[in-house]
Amino acid sequence: MTKGNYSYPLDPSWSTEEITTVLHFLSQVEKAYESKVDRDQLLEAYKAFKTVVPGKASEKQLDKAFQEASGFSTYQAVRAAKAKEKGFVTLGK
């Protein structure tokens, strides 16, 4: 899927640092779909993301909003990364 114009699902109550953390994670997810992303980098970005969005319900809401806007699933990207021991994650068609 090609990169389109869409808005990121961000919470206005987040600090600049928290927004940067979430955007970095979403960027890693985009890379997994558009080309490839290093598994370890994606999981590190996810770990940092979970410090901003620790709850499962909030994570699912953000994933749903991001998937509706972009077509990319954070859940599927993290699942694919966890399934690999090393290397790159590629989810694009």
From Swiss-Prot:
Gene3D superfamilies: BH2638-like. HAMAP family: UPF0223. Belongs to the UPF0223 family. Pfam families: UPF0223. This is UPF0223 protein stu0998.
